[in-house]
């Protein structure tokens, strides 16, 4: 047996060993068992690094033995997938960076394009590579790369349909449609500012000393979050919906400016004239990953993203994470779902019959009356208890009706033994006012959205308005009043951001110096992510209170439990003046009562 044969056999054995380990890690649940997941990841990562190093050291002999470029691309793709899966388990920024580096190298070196193969299996590998790189670029917020990938992916799918006419590529056409729809929904105002926590926008020098000095009797650390959205036909890509994507981004640190990649996303044309394809190069610039990682930032909170979970699965994940939650820590739970089986938003209620306005008001009034008066109340030890927490619900299921798909407020009670920050985004969110466990921080969305142009109210096209306010308040404000990014330049929006930033700084001082701030809010105020959510809630509530008809205010306004101080209520002159400044700056004060 020649030395080349020995090298080839060793390489194949390393590939098989790494793939077996990869299969075991891929099938592990994404949530819980941190120590086991870390150990398994370390083993499979070590196997692939050994394989990667071996092919680099023996590349010439492997090429002589018939190694194809796409085989190296497949190994690199597996490593990228391994990093991405670990990012989804841990939310550690370095893993998404490493995934991006490997996928970008595969694309720039054209591992799958070096030889014009007619092998259907290789084409499927290339399709999967593009779909995964699209998801990584989306989460990593690389818009230029996304645009490039969509063009190439669309071309590849069309090419596959032409060359493999006997094969059905409908599934891949749907992937193209998903990402195009997602990017269309998320493209407005994308250049204003990042959704992630950015020191440039979210750290306010004026109020920073007050935040630094603030210390509650008990301070909780924000460590874990569960994010899930379940609506019919909602905007999504892969298993990331538009709403969960916005929440994911909102709970991440943005690298400082020096850590942005300065290299433009430009690749040569398909001729590949300037790229050396003479050998199966396996060299990937690992230093680029270090350039994209900001060592000054604290770790991101770990986020568990659940796509269309069953109620039992959701409860099981909550229980698992509660069990592993460190002492003196708080968990955020974000639930976005309809309160009625098979109805995902107000727009669908409108189309069920009758005029839009009367249908909306009648249906939502019935919901409100049911919440406020129809359910019986019980007196236990002199305390009034409502049965609402087993009457109203969120709907986590496909078409049809049935109790197993209902998530009741009472289902959350056992987990309130640990500190919780609950965000309920639903047309039946106010049902969670009946939650009667240990006191949790609660944000409850309005029962219906409010827009100048009601066509924007369709959450299947634009996502939730309440979630948009919590993750991108200026963009949500502009969308509400019909103000598009084409209406003005970047400096104009920068000035609008400064108005909001100044307002948030003032409200931070109020919260940090208030003597009436409930302990539930005080113990999370030191956390930058949760503090930013509180400030944005205050802004959202005041904007909607001034924009919406007063006779239907209960349906249009979000609710927080416990109450925040009166000094930051929608009726506060200081808070209203901030909305007034922003509305005047954008020239939309006429849409707000008491502002003109």
Which residues does each PLM region occupy?
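Cysteine protease catalytic core and zymogen-processing segment of caspase-like enzymes
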Residues: 341-474
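Cytosolic small-GTPase signaling regions in large eukaryotic proteins
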Residues: 98-226, 230, 502-541
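Active-site-proximal C-terminal subdomain of hydrolase catalytic domains
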Residues: 420-545
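TPR repeat positional signature
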Residues: 14, 21, 76, 83, ...
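N-terminal alpha-helical scaffolding segments that mark the starts
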Residues: 1-50, 56-57
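Flexible helix-coil transition and linker loops at the boundaries of alpha-helical arrays
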Residues: 51-70, 108-121
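Short coil/turn linking the two alpha-helices of tandem helical-hairpin repeats
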Residues: 25-30, 80, 85-91, 134, ...
């Amino acid at each position: 047996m020649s030395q080349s044969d020995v090298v080839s056999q060793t390489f194949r054995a390393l590939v098989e060993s790494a793939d077996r380990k990869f299969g075991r890690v891929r099938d592990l649940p994404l949530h819980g068992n941190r120590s086991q997941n870390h150990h398994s990841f370390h083993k499979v990562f070590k196997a692939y690094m050994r394989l990667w190093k071996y092919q680099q050291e023996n590349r010439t002999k492997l090429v002589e033995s018939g190694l194809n470029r796409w085989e190296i691309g497949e190994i690199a793709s597996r490593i990228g997938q391994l990093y991405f899966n670990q990012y989804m388990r841990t939310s550690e920024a370095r893993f998404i960076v490493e995934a991006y580096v490997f996928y970008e190298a595969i694309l720039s070196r054209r591992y799958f394009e070096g030889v014009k193969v007619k092998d259907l299996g290789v084409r499927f590998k290339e399709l999967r590579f593009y779909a995964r790189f699209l998801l990584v670029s989306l989460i990593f917020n690389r818009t230029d790369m996304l645009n490039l990938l969509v063009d190439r992916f669309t071309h590849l799918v069309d090419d596959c349909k032409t060359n493999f006419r006997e094969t059905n590529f409908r599934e891949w056409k749907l992937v193209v449609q998903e990402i195009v729809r997602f990017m269309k929904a998320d493209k407005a105002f994308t250049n204003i500012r990042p959704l992630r926590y950015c020191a440039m926008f979210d750290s306010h020098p004026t109020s920073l000393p007050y935040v630094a000095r603030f210390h509650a009797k008990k301070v909780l650390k924000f460590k874990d979050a569960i994010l899930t959205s379940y609506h019919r036909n909602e905007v999504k890509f892969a298993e990331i919906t538009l709403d969960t994507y916005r929440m994911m981004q909102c709970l991440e640190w943005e690298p400082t400016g020096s850590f942005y990649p300065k290299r433009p996303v430009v690749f040569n044309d398909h001729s590949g004239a300037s790229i050396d394809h003479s050998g199966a190069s396996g060299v990937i610039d690992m230093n680029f990953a270090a350039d994209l990682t900001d060592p000054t930032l604290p770790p991101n909170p770990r986020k568990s993203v659940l796509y269309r979970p069953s109620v039992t699965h959701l409860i099981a994940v909550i229980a698992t994470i509660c069990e592993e939650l460190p002492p003196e820590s708080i968990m955020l739970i974000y639930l976005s779902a309809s309160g009625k089986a098979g109805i995902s938003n107000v727009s669908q209620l409108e189309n069920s019959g009758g005029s839009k306005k009367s249908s909306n008001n009648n249906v939502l009034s019935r919901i409100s009356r049911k919440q406020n008066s129809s359910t019986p109340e019980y007196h236990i030890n002199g305390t009034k208890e409502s049965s609402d927490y087993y009457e109203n619900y969120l709907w986590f299921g496909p078409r049809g009706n049935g109790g197993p798909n209902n998530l009741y407020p009472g289902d959350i009670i056992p987990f309130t033994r640990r500190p919780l920050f609950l965000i309920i985004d639903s047309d039946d969110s106010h049902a969670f006012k009946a939650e009667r466990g240990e006191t949790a921080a609660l944000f409850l969305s309005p029962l219906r959205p409010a827009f100048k142009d009601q066509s924007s109210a369709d959450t299947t096209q634009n996502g939730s308005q309440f979630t948009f306010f919590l993750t991108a308040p200026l963009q949500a404000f502009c969308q509400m009043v019909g103000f598009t990014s084409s209406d003005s330049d970047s400096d104009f929006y920068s000035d609008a951001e400064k108005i909001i930033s100044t307002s948030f700084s003032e409200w931070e001082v109020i919260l940090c110096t208030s003597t009436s701030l409930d302990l539930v809010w005080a113990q999370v105020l030191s956390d930058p992510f949760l503090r930013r959510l509180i400030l944005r809630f205050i802004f959202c509530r005041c904007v909607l209170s001034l924009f919406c008809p007063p006779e239907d205010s209960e349906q249009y306004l979000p609710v927080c439990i416990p109450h925040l101080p009166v000094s930051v209520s929608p009726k506060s002159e200081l808070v209203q003046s901030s909305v007034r400044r922003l509305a005047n700056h954008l020239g939309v004060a006429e849409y707000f009562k008491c502002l003109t």
